[in-house]
Amino acid sequence: MIPTYNEIGNKCALIIRRVMEDGEQSHGKNVWFNNESSQRQVLLAARHLLTYQLQASGDKPADGDDHLVNALVRVAMAIAKRDECGTLSE
């Protein structure tokens, strides 16, 4: 049986709560994000997307589309950084 979007969202919510529970207490500045790299930008983008998903599902108070915008900016930064290093495959 194919899961619904709501079921997928609920699983994502459980995962992000489990993985990022330390991040909630320290505003996301835990060891996972303490390096300057394109990988860090992608991890932060994923966190923003998951936070946006939680807000959209009503599990967290919504503050507009800030997390969605931040996620898109982070991904763009990661792509630009990889492109500068010549590691972006076409």
Residue ranges of model-derived segments:
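Intrinsically disordered, low-complexity regulatory regions
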Residues: M1-E90
